[in-house]
A protein has these predicted regions:
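Charged catalytic cores and adjacent phosphate/nucleic-acid-binding surfaces used
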Residues: 28, 79-183
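Extended substrate/RNA-proximal surfaces in nucleic-acid metabolism proteins
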Residues: 1-102
Length: 183
């Protein structure tokens, strides 16, 4: 989390941005979660700490949508086939979603887990439904496409997930203003 650097960037370039995603990749010591050795740590404790960082970001960052809320889960599964039960974090997610909705922000449904080992979206259906239950309406779809061939992947599945979770609209942004498109 580097809100100061992000704020400077947005101040200097905000007039040309349509959309700003806030996300957490790194926590302490600037080590991306990607590099964690999940066999040597208490993953429940680490994920609890990760959600605390998401809460901090929700309170102080200048962004439109929070990206891939369950980022560590992708690598827990990819490397160690670990699946973490998210129910213990439900109250923190409720607070996170309250923070986001009160500030007119949303979340991203990231489908990159489908074309990686995890075979699930980030966040999974249980968290999508919780976000909707908490009043969340602003939602985007991202594919985390680090390669051109992944742009637009799994859009049909993403739309179906959103409809199943109770969403009626997908959100796009222009000049950082949300626009709602019927699913």
């Amino acid at each position: 989390v580097n809100p100061e650097a992000a704020a400077l960037f947005i101040r200097d370039y905000g007039d040309v941005l349509d959309f700003v995603i806030g996300s957490i990749h790194n926590m302490e010591k600037d080590l991306d979660v990607y590099y964690y050795d999940f066999e040597k740590i208490d993953v429940s404790k680490m994920y609890d700490h990760y959600v605390d960082w998401l809460l901090k970001l929700s309170e102080m960052g200048d962004f439109d949508v929070m990206g891939h809320l369950t980022y560590p889960l992708r690598y827990m599964f990819e490397r160690n086939h670990l699946r973490l039960e998210l129910r213990p974090y439900e109250e923190k997610f409720r607070q996170l979603f309250k923070n986001l909705t009160e500030k007119g922000r949303g979340i991203e449904l990231n489908v990159s887990g489908y074309y990686k080992a995890m075979q699930d979206a980030m966040p999974p259906m249980s968290i999508l439904k919780l976000y909707r239950e908490c009043g969340g309406e602003i939602i985007t779809i991202g594919s985390d496409a680090h390669k051109a061939e992944y742009i637009g992947f799994y859009q049909k599945e993403a739309h179906e997930m959103l409809e199943t979770a109770g969403f009626r609209y997908l959100t796009v942004f222009e000049h950082r203003k949300p626009e709602f498109i019927k699913l």
